[in-house]
Structure formats: structure tokens, C-alpha cells
Amino acid sequence: MTTPATVLQRVTVHTVTSKDTLEAHPVELPDYERGRFDDIAFMTAMNLCLMGNYAQTGHFGGPLAYTPYNVACHLAGPDLGGLRYDLRNPKFPYSDKFMLSGGHNIPTCYALWMILYEALRQQHVATGDDRFAVDPNVAILPIDALGFRRG
């Protein structure tokens, strides 16, 4: 169940001090569209499972565990601690750099990027608006998954 975006959540985060005692820190979570994040995370998880099953490879525990983090980093925006970047120009020198350690976890990135690039592609086709145009040599599209670890 997701929390409505209009509700400001209050949570308590506990940290362990150097004296092995717990300290409580009340934190207010800002409003954001959690339902949309959950939807994209679900689609990303399903996409990476489909890719892995098609390629007959791997174990999905790592990538599935990283999926919510990956989605939040890419979609939250800098005001909520996310990346400052433009998906249409991923090599822009002044955008934030994204590195996910653990090479086996990269499928979550591929799965998310496919969803985001496909959304841009479909929006460009539907509207003709060049703001949604992406160079197909830069984009990672679903058709690209056919060659992942296959063969």
C-alpha cells in the first residue's frame, strides 16, 4: 500500500553512536509521488525478470534489491536527493555521475533505462514534440534486450 502524496510522513531514524547507544532522530519526509515511484519500480522489476528469464541467466536477488534505490535516484530529482541529469544527454559533463557497484546488479539499470527511454520514444511519437526526442544510438530500448547475455 502506498502513502498518499499529500501526507507528510514523520519517521524516526535510529543511529548507533560510538558509545553503542541508540540515538533517535525524527525525520519528516517531503511530499512526493510515491505511487508513481512504486509503479515504475514494479515495471522495472518485472522487466529485469523478463530479461533474465529470456537470457536464461542469473539470480535476481541483487538487482531486485537495488531496484527501489535505482528508481529513486533516477526519478526523485535533486531536491529530493536524486540525480541531476538529463536522460536524453547522459554524457553531459556537468550532470551527476551514477555508479552502481556490484556488476551483477546492472540489470536493474538496464531495465529502468529501457522503460524511461521507451516512455520518451512513445511520447515523441504521440506528440511530435522534440523535447521527447532521443538519439536511438544513445537510448537503451527494449529491442536492445534481445542481445543481452544471449547466445
Task: Label every PLM stretch briefly.
Residues 1-72:
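Conserved acidic/glycine
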Residues 64-151:
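Cofactor-binding active-site loop characterized by glycine-rich and histidine/acidic residues
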